[in-house]
Structures are given as C-alpha cells and as structure tokens.
A protein has these predicted regions:
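Boundary/linker segments flanking structured domains
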Residues: 1-54, 60-66, 70-193
C-alpha cells in the first residue's frame, strides 16, 4: 500500500474537490445543452447563468428517457418537479423519490430550443419538445407520444409508497455525501496516474 506523500487539511481537500467538481460540470456543458447527474443537480442552489436560457429538460438514466418537458426557465421547472414529487404533485418527481437512492444516478439534461438541433422545427418551443418526445418515447409523457416506452422492471412505479420517506433536506444531504465520496474516489484515482 502506498503511503500518502501529503497530508491535506479538510479545507484543502474540500477546495480541491470543489475545483474538480466545477471542471467536471464544465465538461458536460455547451451553449445549448447541459447534462448533469441528478445528485449534482440537487446541490445547485442557484441556476448557473449559462443555463438560464435553456427551456427544455429531460429526466433520464443511461438507457431510458423518463420524461421530457418545456418551460421558459427549465432549471426552476426541474426543481418544481422534484419538490412537487416529494409532496405528491408531480409524477416524475414522485418517481425520482420512490426510486431513491437509485435515482441519484439519473441524469438531468437542460437544452435550448434555439439550438441548431431544433432548427428543423423552426426553433419553436412546443415543436422542439414534441420532437424530443417523438425521438425518445419517454415513459411518462402521454401527450404527443403514441408508444411510451415501458418503465423498466428495475424501477418502482411512481404510485408505490415511499420506502425511505425523509425530509427533502435529508435526501439532498444524502446526495451531497454521494457526490463527495465520488469526487474523493475520482481524485484518488487521478493521483495514481
């Protein structure tokens, strides 16, 4: 076993991990799209400036799209779903919390209807949302979706009782611990190289 050459204070380690975290977020961002794991999204208290123009959002895992939506401020709308799901007012939000902690690995994508990708529909917001729904056939989009993909058996449906009912703050704290552990593991892996 290799012995550490440096002894880090908690503040130094936190600052280094924060720098790494910010770089990692930058890798998943462009002017018209941001992709971020749900557990990291939950730690954002404010919308990054570059994301304020994004008006489409996607809840997904590595192989299935669960939901596509539109809003003039997609970041805030994703938060509304998450908070509403905790209180039973959003089906996609409830699905996230019914599948906690597995859902920490879900991905949130924020997109701009003004990007080249949506030029084929004149960059119109509703038409851009419809294009994404037709492309991916999300599990929970019923409108404009002739054949929604069936929810994979590995996930609980949103109508089951919460298995781990806690306060929203406790769940966010769990996400924070998971991010810290992941960042520390990545940092150590990079130190070995």
């Amino acid at each position: 076993m290799r012995q550490a050459a440096y002894h880090w204070t908690d503040d130094q380690l936190h600052a280094t991990l924060l720098d790494y975290h910010l770089l990692q977020k930058a890798w998943n961002m462009s002017d018209s799209k941001a992709t971020i794991p749900l557990k990291r999204f939950l730690l954002l208290e404010r919308c990054p400036t570059a994301w304020k123009e994004m008006d489409l959002y996607v809840f997904r895992d590595e192989s299935v799209v669960f939901y596509v939506g539109q809003s003039h401020f997609a970041f805030a709308r994703v938060w509304e779903h998450l908070i509403g799901g905790f209180h039973g007012h959003s089906i996609i939000g409830r699905f996230v919390w019914c599948n906690w902690p597995k859902s920490m690995k879900f991905t949130i994508e924020l997109l701009s209807s003004q990007s080249e990708e949506f030029g084929v529909v004149g960059n119109e917001l509703s038409a851009s949302e419809c294009l994404l729904i037709q492309r991916w056939s999300p599990c929970f989009n019923i409108s404009q979706n002739n054949q929604p993909i069936l929810l994979p058996d590995s996930y609980l449906p949103p109508n089951v009782p919460f298995r781990r009912r806690r306060s929203l703050n406790m769940l966010i704290h769990e996400a924070e611990r998971a991010v810290q552990a992941e960042d520390a593991q990545l940092w150590l892996k990079n130190m070995e190289v």
